[in-house]
Amino acid sequence: MNPLLEKKFGDEFTRVENALTALRSGKGILVSDSPDRENEADLIFSAEFLTETQMAMLIRECSGIVCLCLTTEKVQALALPMMVSENTSGFQTAFTVSIEAKTGVKTGVSAADRVRTVKTAIAADAKPEELARPGHVFPLRARTGGVLERPGHTEATVDLMRLAGLSPYGVLCELTNPDGTMANLDEAIAFAEKHDFPVLTVEDVINYRLEKEREKSASPALFSVFEN
């Protein structure tokens, strides 16, 4: 584990709990994956609480490819086909076709327009015909098992929204440095301290979920009270 991460943001459970608190408050978080994987940090916001200011930060401080993480059920409800029939990408990132809200947008690329597209897509009564394809927002389909099935940013995003008690949809973009290179964990920590964002890792989310599911198995009656 990165010693700077633990020094600045506490142990793995503290990091997850702080991230959940931030998400419930409508704030952003930074999630890093393994150095053996992409070794990147993604800036993540709840789609439910997403603002134009937050979208502008994603566009300005990150790669610009703003993605909307969706459950499989939502992807099916919106009738979104996958971007390709055969996914040959190294990490099997599940892009669907890109989307745009059909109403309330101009070019579709501004922060306001992208927020409009996100809000249109995640609405409980959203219909496929309300979205144009292609567009400037890139949906990602999360695996049903979350990070326990695939240790990716997409699954971590949806899992964290669920753990926070929010709608299970989030917006993410890969954090970049001013020179255009991808931000590693140490660089993400510096960015987070500047902007007051919690930082955690995908591994933190995996371990948090495993522990919570162990607790649930040990005390099913106790957890049934919270679930009702």
From Swiss-Prot:
<keyword id="KW-0479">Metal-binding</keyword>
<feature type="binding site">
    <location>
        <position position="38"/>
    </location>
    <ligand>
        <name>Mg(2+) 2</name>
    </ligand>
</feature>
<feature type="binding site">
    <location>
        <begin position="150"/>
        <end position="154"/>
    </location>
    <ligand>
        <name>D-ribulose 5-phosphate</name>
    </ligand>
</feature>
<feature type="binding site">
    <location>
        <begin position="37"/>
        <end position="38"/>
    </location>
    <ligand>
        <name>D-ribulose 5-phosphate</name>
    </ligand>
</feature>
<keyword id="KW-0686">Riboflavin biosynthesis</keyword>
<dbReference type="GO" id="GO:0030145">
    <property type="term" value="F:manganese ion binding"/>
</dbReference>
<comment type="similarity">
    <text>Belongs to the DHBP synthase family.</text>
</comment>
<feature type="binding site">
    <location>
        <position position="38"/>
    </location>
    <ligand>
        <name>Mg(2+) 1</name>
    </ligand>
</feature>
<feature type="site" description="Essential for catalytic activity">
    <location>
        <position position="136"/>
    </location>
</feature>
<dbReference type="GO" id="GO:0005829">
    <property type="term" value="C:cytosol"/>
</dbReference>
<comment type="function">
    <text>Catalyzes the conversion of D-ribulose 5-phosphate to formate and 3,4-dihydroxy-2-butanone 4-phosphate.</text>
</comment>
<comment type="subunit">
    <text>Homodimer.</text>
</comment>
<feature type="site" description="Essential for catalytic activity">
    <location>
        <position position="174"/>
    </location>
</feature>
<dbReference type="InterPro" id="IPR017945">
    <property type="entry name" value="DHBP_synth_RibB-like_a/b_dom"/>
</dbReference>
<protein>
    <recommendedName>
        <fullName>3,4-dihydroxy-2-butanone 4-phosphate synthase</fullName>
        <ecNumber>4.1.99.12</ecNumber>
    </recommendedName>
</protein>
<dbReference type="InterPro" id="IPR000422">
    <property type="entry name" value="DHBP_synthase_RibB"/>
</dbReference>
<keyword id="KW-0460">Magnesium</keyword>
<dbReference type="GO" id="GO:0008686">
    <property type="term" value="F:3,4-dihydroxy-2-butanone-4-phosphate synthase activity"/>
</dbReference>
<feature type="binding site">
    <location>
        <position position="42"/>
    </location>
    <ligand>
        <name>D-ribulose 5-phosphate</name>
    </ligand>
</feature>
<dbReference type="Pfam" id="PF00926">
    <property type="entry name" value="DHBP_synthase"/>
</dbReference>
<dbReference type="GO" id="GO:0000287">
    <property type="term" value="F:magnesium ion binding"/>
</dbReference>
<feature type="binding site">
    <location>
        <position position="174"/>
    </location>
    <ligand>
        <name>D-ribulose 5-phosphate</name>
    </ligand>
</feature>
<keyword id="KW-0464">Manganese</keyword>
<comment type="pathway">
    <text>Cofactor biosynthesis; riboflavin biosynthesis; 2-hydroxy-3-oxobutyl phosphate from D-ribulose 5-phosphate: step 1/1.</text>
</comment>
<feature type="binding site">
    <location>
        <position position="153"/>
    </location>
    <ligand>
        <name>Mg(2+) 2</name>
    </ligand>
</feature>
<dbReference type="GO" id="GO:0009231">
    <property type="term" value="P:riboflavin biosynthetic process"/>
</dbReference>
<keyword id="KW-0456">Lyase</keyword>
